[in-house]
């Protein structure tokens, strides 16, 4: 049996592919943009498909060819690109997810694992705790597309019996991230310090943002996919990330344990701060993910940064 990963050349998708290859799975990777260095060391151990999620015929062809036991649907546009180009975000995120689910229905693929986001939360949050059932009223195009896709997945689950499961990721941190988004400073500050380059962090030192290391993000998808169907009651699961949630100042302090001379300055951006201000003072409760399928992150803030630098040292070609 095989598995299909959309967005397979991305930060999480490429790590997920590596993990699946190591498990002996037959892996098919689909992406619009191919980045060959992502798979250095495992070339030839996967089947690569180049396709746009907005092209239904290409998605049908990919699902028919791969005939996977499960589709990991990670492909899509992130927050800032989605807000800058909402039309493309609709075509990629909304129509693209419909194409994946409809292809799964047509070719009798019974399981779809979807990556959503905590950006589905926005207005009218009743602080101080957000959980899986908190009102989802996003303030961005990105968050809006993800709410729709969660609901579409639930519809396909109810009407067609597709075993749809989803996680709502916090900010995912890892080396080699290229696309700007509203919390990318958590990754770029770490990476710029490694390369000896200055970096302006676009939030205040006190700003707290939930983060999850990319290896934990990929591992969460494996755990969710492997859970027995009867355990999956909540369907769409919030992941809180590293606990306790660190501030931007604490991130910088942890980086400077490795690179004391790192040139990291704070230059808050009004748009970014408007977004982040709505989530300050909030605790994220992911206890149902732990209860229903055994979720628990392995990396602390310090462990994440140490492994981040280990990855950059061991695999420089993969992340540049």
What are these regions (language model features)?
Residues 3-23:
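N-terminal Rossmann NAD(P)H-binding glycine-rich loop of SDR-like oxidoreductase domains
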Residues 25-36:
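Conserved glycine-rich Rossmann-like NAD(P)H-binding loop of the short-chain dehydrogenase/reductase
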Residues 43-55:
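Rossmann-fold cofactor-recognition segment
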Residues 53-92:
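NAD(P)H-binding glycine-rich loop region in Rossmannoid oxidoreductase-like domains
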Residues 98-141:
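Conserved Rossmann-fold NAD(P)-dependent oxidoreductase catalytic core, especially the SDR/UDP-sugar
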Residues 123-126, 137-165, 194:
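Active-site Tyr-X1-5-Lys
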Residues 154-209, 214-222:
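NAD(P)-dependent short-chain dehydrogenase/reductase
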Residues 202-204, 209-320:
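C-terminal substrate-binding subdomain of Rossmann-fold SDR/epimerase-dehydratase oxidoreductases
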């Amino acid at each position: 049996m095989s598995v299909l990963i959309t967005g397979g050349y991305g930060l999480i998708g490429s790590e997920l592919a590596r993990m699946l290859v190591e498990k002996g799975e037959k892996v098919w990777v689909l992406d619009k943009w191919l980045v060959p260095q992502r798979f250095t060391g495992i070339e030839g151990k996967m089947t690569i498909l180049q396709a746009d999620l907005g092209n239904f015929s290409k998605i049908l062809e990919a699902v028919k060819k791969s005939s996977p036991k499960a589709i990991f649907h990670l492909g899509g546009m992130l927050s800032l690109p989605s807000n800058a180009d909402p039309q493309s975000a609709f075509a990629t995120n909304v129509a693209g997810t419909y194409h994946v689910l409809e292809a799964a229905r047509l070719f009798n693929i019974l399981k779809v694992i979807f990556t959503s986001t905590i950006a589905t939360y926005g207005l009218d949050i009743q602080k101080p705790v957000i959980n899986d059932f908190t009102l989802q009223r996003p303030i961005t195009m990105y968050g809006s597309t993800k709410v729709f896709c969660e609901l579409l997945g639930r519809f396909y689950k109810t009407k067609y019996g597709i075993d749809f499961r989803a996680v709502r990721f916090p900010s995912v941190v890892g080396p080699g991230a290229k696309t700007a988004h509203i919390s990318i400073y958590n990754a770029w500050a770490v990476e710029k310090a490694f390369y000896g380059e200055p970096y302006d962090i676009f939030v205040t030192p006190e700003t707290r943002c939930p983060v999850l290391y990319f290896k934990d993000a990929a591992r969460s998808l494996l755990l969710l996919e492997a859970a027995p169907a009867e355990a999956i009651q909540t369907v769409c699961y919030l992941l809180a990330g590293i606990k306790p949630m660190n501030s931007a100042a604490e991130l910088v302090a942890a980086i400077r344990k490795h690179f004391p001379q790192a040139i990291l300055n704070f230059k808050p951006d009004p748009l970014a701060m408007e977004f982040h201000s709505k989530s300050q003072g909030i605790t994220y409760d992911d206890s149902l993910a732990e209860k229903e399928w055994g979720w628990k992150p392995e990396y602390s803030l310090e462990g994440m940064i140490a492994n981040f630098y280990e990855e950059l040292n061991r695999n420089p070609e993969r992340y540049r």
